[in-house]
């Protein structure tokens, strides 16, 4: 009897552990202000101009034991750009930059994930911005996961990439120090 009980407990523990190692689906927690899509670009080579996008949503699946099976999808409203300066934001929304009247949404959808070290990954995917779709690689880092105080389960990541403005049809010349923009992404997802 004791052997059967121990065997059942061992099998149950193994199945429970296997279930925890399977991929889980998450929705990015934008509503709780636990996710950000920020950017920075050099201003004349003297300082950094920082900004954010306020309106976006997305989801991801993640399996720590098999990260190459992970997937990411994000949709962003380009008109939600905020650089803390109303006139500059109006210019960024214009045809000189994001052309939000013609291209109101930017999207990123992963095509592959590759482990690059302990808790680090390269997420390859297609970024559609300003009417142009190009492959990009986001260098990402797993921050952590666990239960939250409200009965849910969360996982968090940060990442970043550099984009050449001209690659996405942005022809406005900002000078030699401002040809690229850094995207800085921080997300916390709630498991579904």
Swiss-Prot record:
| Matches recorded under Pfam families | YceI
Q: Where is the signal peptide?
A: 1-23
Q: List the disulfide bonds.
A: none
Under SUPFAM superfamilies, the record lists: YceI-like
**Keyword match Transcription:** no
Give the domain of life: Bacteria
What does the UniProt entry say about where the protein is found?
Periplasm
Q: GO CC annotations?
A: periplasmic space
Transmembrane intervals: none
Which UniProt key words apply to this protein? Periplasm, Signal
Q: Do you know which InterPro entries this protein is assigned to?
A: Lipid/polyisoprenoid-bd_YceI, TTHA0802/YceI-like_sf, UPF0312/YceI
SMART domains assigned: YceI (SM00867)
What family is it from?
Answer: Belongs to the UPF0312 family. Type 1 subfamily.
What name is this protein filed under? UPF0312 protein Avin_03250
* Annotated source species: Azotobacter vinelandii (strain DJ / ATCC BAA-1303)
């Amino acid at each position: 009897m004791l052997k059967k009980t121990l065997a059942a407990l061992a099998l149950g523990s193994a199945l429970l552990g296997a279930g925890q190692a399977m991929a889980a689906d998450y929705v990015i927690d934008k509503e709780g202000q636990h996710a950000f899509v920020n950017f920075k670009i050099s201003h004349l080579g003297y300082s950094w101009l920082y900004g954010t996008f306020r309106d976006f949503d997305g989801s991801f699946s993640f399996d720590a034991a098999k990260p190459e099976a992970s997937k990411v999808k994000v949709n962003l409203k380009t008109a939600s750009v905020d650089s803390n300066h109303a006139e500059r934001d109006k210019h960024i929304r214009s045809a000189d930059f994001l052309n939000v009247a013609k291209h109101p949404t930017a999207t990123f959808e992963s095509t592959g994930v590759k482990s690059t070290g302990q808790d680090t990954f390269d997420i390859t995917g297609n970024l559609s911005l300003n009417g142009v779709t190009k492959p990009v690689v986001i260098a990402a880092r797993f921050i952590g996961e666990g239960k939250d105080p409200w009965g849910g389960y969360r996982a968090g990541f940060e990442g970043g990439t550099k984009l050449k403005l001209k690659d996405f049809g942005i022809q406005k010349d900002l000078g030699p120090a401002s040809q690229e923009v850094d995207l800085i992404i921080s997300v916390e997802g709630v498991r579904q």
